[in-house]
């Protein structure tokens, strides 16, 4: 009888443990876009979203910018990364590798914000489709969300109408 009770307790524990571990894997991760021409408040909207996200997130929130400008309004809980500090990251592939390395080094990252994505490395409207595909892959593999701001009208961004992307404006 004791062995039976022990087995039931262990099975219950393992079942509960498995459901806790699979929660993060079952959550649907996504690439979210904020679009619009220069001067339409995309950066401020991204900062507000990051500040809200850090209050409700169970993981770490990262905010990637080109420069140190306007980072003072970010909540102290948001990890700000300025790409000026990494001048050798010049290509889209290097930038994607940087993201993979960041996620591999910190499995607690829940959300990554990338402000002014067209100013990062050599990302342009010509190759943003490939970049967003890479983000979707990273998002799915690591169950994290991306929020990116693009300094262009929604209509000028190729392949934006995919189920993998959510346009917020």
Description of each model-found segment:
Residues 3, 63-64, 113, 135:
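Conserved short hydrophobic patches within well-ordered secondary structure
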Residues 5, 71-72, 105-109:
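Short hydrophobic/aromatic-rich motifs at helix boundaries and adjacent loops
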Residues 31-101, 157-159:
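Conserved P-loop
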């Amino acid at each position: 009888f004791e062995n039976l009770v022990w087995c039931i307790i262990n099975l219950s524990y393992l079942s509960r443990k498995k459901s806790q571990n699979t929660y993060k894997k079952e959550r649907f991760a996504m690439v979210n876009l904020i679009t619009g021409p220069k001067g339409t408040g995309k950066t401020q909207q991204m900062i507000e979203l990051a500040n809200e996200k850090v209050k409700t997130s169970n993981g770490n929130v990262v905010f990637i910018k080109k420069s140190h400008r306007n980072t003072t309004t970010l909540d102290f809980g948001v990890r700000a990364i300025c790409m000026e500090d990494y001048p050798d990251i010049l290509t889209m592939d290097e930038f994607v590798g940087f993201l993979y390395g960041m996620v591999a080094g910190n499995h607690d990252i829940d959300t990554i914000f990338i402000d002014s994505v067209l100013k990062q490395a050599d990302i342009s409207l010509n190759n943003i489709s490939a970049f967003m595909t890479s983000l979707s892959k990273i998002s799915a593999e690591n169950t994290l969300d991306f929020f990116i701001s693009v300094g262009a009208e929604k209509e000028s961004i190729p392949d934006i109408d995919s189920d993998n992307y959510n346009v917020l404006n």
